[in-house]
């Protein structure tokens, strides 16, 4: 069983390979497909935006079955996302959850520009991001994205009786991070 520290190191090393264009492209062959057909054992869970420019398996140079990925616009944490993380932690025993925000997030920009009028379910998305706007030192999208990823990680740590004991016992670490679209670097928050 891998520890949270080792999982985080593995993600950082994979991101370094991605940034330097020296990717290994692991676990992307027929043998791996056959292996994971029997079950999955991801070493980390990643909650990230649905933005097509933010594919965690590529950013971290991982392959099929390595990451348990939950994608939702604005990397928001809803009850459904919490349930998915609970499944990953309690049943798949992932030791690490990363809430990954990113530069240029359209959901954050939409929440900043929101005037109270929108059709459909977009106001639901905006309502989850608005507290991060209020808590942000600035009103620019990048500042809000950083605060928002940290806020969503905090929400996960505190909001569920299933995750809190795992975090308290250090069986699970929940961290926030930010992906820079220009440099390719994923920066883990302190």
Tell where the protein language model's regions lie, with residue ranges.
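Terminal alpha-helical anchor/extension segments at protein ends
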Residues: 6, 44, 49, 53-60, ...
């Amino acid at each position: 069983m891998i520890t949270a520290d080792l999982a985080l190191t593995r993600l950082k090393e994979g991101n370094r390979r991605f940034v330097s264009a020296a990717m290994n492209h692991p676990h992307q062959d027929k043998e791996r497909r056959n292996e994971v057909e029997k079950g999955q054992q991801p070493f980390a869970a990643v909650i990230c935006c649905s933005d097509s420019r933010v594919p965690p398996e590529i950013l971290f140079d991982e392959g099929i079955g390595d990451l348990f990925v939950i994608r939702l616009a604005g990397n928001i944490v809803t009850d459904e996302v919490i349930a998915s993380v609970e499944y990953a932690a309690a049943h798949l025993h992932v030791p690490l959850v990363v809430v990954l925000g990113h530069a240029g997030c359209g959901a954050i920009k939409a929440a900043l520009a929101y005037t109270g009028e929108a059709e459909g379910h977009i106001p639901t998305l905006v309502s989850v991001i608005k507290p991060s706007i209020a808590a942000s030192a600035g009103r620019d999208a990048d500042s809000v994205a950083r605060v928002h990823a940290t806020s969503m990680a905090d929400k996960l740590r505190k909001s569920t009786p299933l995750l809190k004991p795992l975090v308290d016992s250090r069986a699970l670490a929940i961290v926030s991070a930010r992906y820079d679209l220009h440099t390719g670097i994923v920066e883990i928050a302190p």
